[in-house]
């Protein structure tokens, strides 16, 4: 499973769902304009 809000990802971007970014070790939602 992939992670969404506040999911711990460390430095691994693959821990976050598509459309989410690993930021400060947690998954954050990213809006592509």
From Swiss-Prot:
This is Kappa-sparatoxin-Hv1a. One of its GO terms (cellular component) is extracellular region. One of its GO terms (molecular function) is potassium channel regulator activity. InterPro entries: Huwentoxin-1. The presence of a 'disulfide through disulfide knot' structurally defines this protein as a knottin. Belongs to the neurotoxin 10 (Hwtx-1) family. 21 (HpTx1) subfamily. Coiled coil: none annotated. Keywords: Amidation, Calcium channel impairing toxin, Disulfide bond, Ion channel impairing toxin, Knottin, Neurotoxin, Potassium channel impairing toxin, Secreted, Toxin, Voltage-gated potassium channel impairing toxin. It is found in: Secreted. It comes from the Eukaryota. The modification Tryptophan amide is found at residue 33.
